[in-house]
Every structure is written in structure tokens, then in C-alpha cells.
């Protein structure tokens, strides 16, 4: 190993900036600065720390057979990969449509005895059906508390019922809004 010190040679001139005409009038000197090696100095060729091979965190233990198949598949060209996919689809009797998750939800059951997949509703609408005249003020206050509507807009909302009060909200929010409006005297439904 060569030298373990770093040398930098620099020329130091006067602190003022000389002009081109007077550049030779200032004395200059060359200074060498040496930095010690960060591995213990001297001419030691041994390192105090050694790098070790670490496996990536996402590495998966796989049998040799699987590793061999994986490396062979990864070396295929696009055309060969397409042919392999077609071959495996024919061999196992599957089609790309049968693998799509949306196709499973839309497809009808194969036999008449199987129950259809029921999709759970995630978005709800709160509908104000009726507001008795004796509780209009309380309902307007409840509407303003649940929304950011001004007094005029809240008043217009409870006229000409039934009207959707809130749309596309979660079940918990819909239940809370229904409870608040019913306590104020309105007749409310969740759709």
C-alpha cells in the first residue's frame, strides 16, 4: 500500500489582492500540509474494520429448486414469457378474466344454490324527510352545528322536504347526524 497520508501543496500570497503589474513584488512561499491516515497512521496496510456481507431485509429463503426456476424465468425474453403464460393458462385451465378480482364480484354464481356476494355499503346519505313547524328553529340550529352553512342556507335546506342533508359519509357520521337531527325534532332517514 502506498502512503497513508494526504499531502496538499498550496501557494500562500499576501493578504491583499495584487494587481497584475505588482504580482512579482510580493513574496510567496509554498506550504505543504499533511493529514494523518484515518486508519491508524503509519504505513499499516491492515484495516481495523472489515465489511461483512449482509442480506437484504426483504430476502426470502427459497429452496434451490425455486431459485433455479426463478433465475430461468427472469432470463426469458418478453416473447418467451408471453408463451410461458399462455402455456400455463392452457395447462391449468385458467383465463386472465378469471384472475381479475372485479370479475369475481360481478360474475353470477355457478350453481343456483350458491348465495350471491353481498357488497357492504360504505357511503351513506342522510335525508331530512319532515320538520314539524314547532321544531324548525331547533332543527336549523342542529343543521348549522353539523355543517358550515349560514342561517339563510340552513333555513332553505329544511324547506321543500325531503332533501338530502349530507351525502357520501360514513355510517358513524350518518348515525350521529340522524341522532342530532331527531333530538331537534326532525324526521330523518339514512339511505
Curated annotation (Swiss-Prot):
Extract the transit peptide range from the record.
1-58
Localization of this protein: Plastid, Chloroplast
Question: What keywords tag this UniProt record?
Answer: Chloroplast, Plastid, Ribonucleoprotein, Ribosomal protein, Transit peptide
Q: Gene3D superfamilies, per this entry?
A: 3.30.1390.10, Single helix bin
Q: Name one GO biological process term.
A: translation
Which GO CC terms are listed, alphabetically?
Answer: chloroplast; chloroplast envelope; chloroplast nucleoid; chloroplast stroma; chloroplast thylakoid membrane; cytosol; plasmodesma; plastid large ribosomal subunit
Example of a GO MF term: structural constituent of ribosome
* Spans through the membrane: none
**InterPro entries, per the entry:** Ribosomal_bL12, Ribosomal_bL12_C, Ribosomal_bL12_C/ClpS-like, Ribosomal_bL12_oligo, Ribosomal_bL12_oligo_N_sf
What is the similarity comment for this entry? Belongs to the bacterial ribosomal protein bL12 family.
What protein name is recorded for this chain? Large ribosomal subunit protein bL12cz
Amino acid at each position: 500500500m502506498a502512503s497513508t497520508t494526504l499531502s496538499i501543496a498550496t501557494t500562500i500570497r499576501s493578504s491583499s489582492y495584487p494587481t497584475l503589474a505588482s504580482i512579482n513584488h510580493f513574496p510567496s512561499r509554498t506550504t505543504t500540509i499533511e493529514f494523518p491516515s484515518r486508519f491508524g497512521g503509519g504505513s499499516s496496510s491492515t484495516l481495523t474494520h472489515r465489511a461483512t456481507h449482509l442480506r437484504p431485509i426483504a430476502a426470502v429463503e427459497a429452496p434451490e429448486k425455486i431459485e433455479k426456476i426463478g433465475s430461468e424465468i427472469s432470463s426469458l425474453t418478453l416473447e418467451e414469457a408471453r408463451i410461458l403464460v399462455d402455456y400455463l393458462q392452457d395447462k391449468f385451465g385458467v383465463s386472465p378474466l378469471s384472475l381479475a378480482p372485479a370479475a369475481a364480484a360481478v360474475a353470477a354464481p355457478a350453481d343456483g344454490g350458491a348465495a350471491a356476494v353481498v357488497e357492504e355499503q360504505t357511503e351513506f346519505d342522510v335525508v331530512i324527510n319532515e320538520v314539524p313547524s314547532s321544531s324548525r328553529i331547533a332543527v336549523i340550529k342542529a343543521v348549522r352545528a353539523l355543517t358550515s352553512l349560514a342561517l339563510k342556507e340552513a333555513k332553505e335546506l329544511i324547506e321543500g322536504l325531503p332533501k338530502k342533508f349530507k351525502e357520501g359519509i360514513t355510517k358513524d357520521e350518518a348515525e350521529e347526524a340522524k341522532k342530532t337531527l331527531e333530538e331537534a325534532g326532525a324526521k330523518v332517514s339514512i339511505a
